[in-house]
Amino acid sequence: MSHSSKAILLRYGEDMEGIERLANLSEVWVSAGSPLQTPAEIAKGIKTWIRDIPEFKKFFFSLPPEVDRKYVRDTVSNCRLTFAERFIATMVWGYGNVGYGPYRVSKMLASENLDTKLSISWGLAREGAALDAYNYLKDNRIEQLGPAFATKWLYFCSDEPVEIPIYDSVVARWIGEHAKEHFAGVPISSEYWSANTYSRYLNFLSKASQLTGLKAGELEYLIFLDAQSN
């Protein structure tokens, strides 16, 4: 680790827990060529998606057998698609072949004023207003959409270089193991909406970004990799 990186860690003091681990993970990842996440295989479950959401059958058939983060980001940025289609692409990536996913998403799609909620949250995310976008969906709920999958939607809505990071159960578990001191006084769980928790998470990743030079989405991915390997 460079002298400047060590100086940043010293400045953070007790908040360095977790940040130093991310710094070490980033060095390994970058030296390995920054490999991308393995695409999510969705072909096996596509019939269930079509069964539970038949009105989007044509869209489901347009999806490739595997989807990665770049594919979903490009899809969510495609203004020729409806907001519902863009949202579905995110949920398919998030749930993959999990059996209950299509049913839950069918309930989300039936939510009142869905198009308005998706378009407003998309716009806030494109502006890089992470906490505003999070709070909007917290205050204007989409049925069955909790904060974990809401942040997946916001992540793909956000435009590089500003990335709105995912905060799901995998991230929350890693935080509890490696960075809980930074989250003192706020709930760590991703199951419940908490602007304080998400704000603390954004602050944590901002500090890690200053140290590593990586974007928030890249740091979240490293957290995901580290959590999955343990």
Predicted segments, located by residue:
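Short, hydrophobic/aromatic alpha-helical segments in well-folded domains
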Residues: 136, 150-153, 204
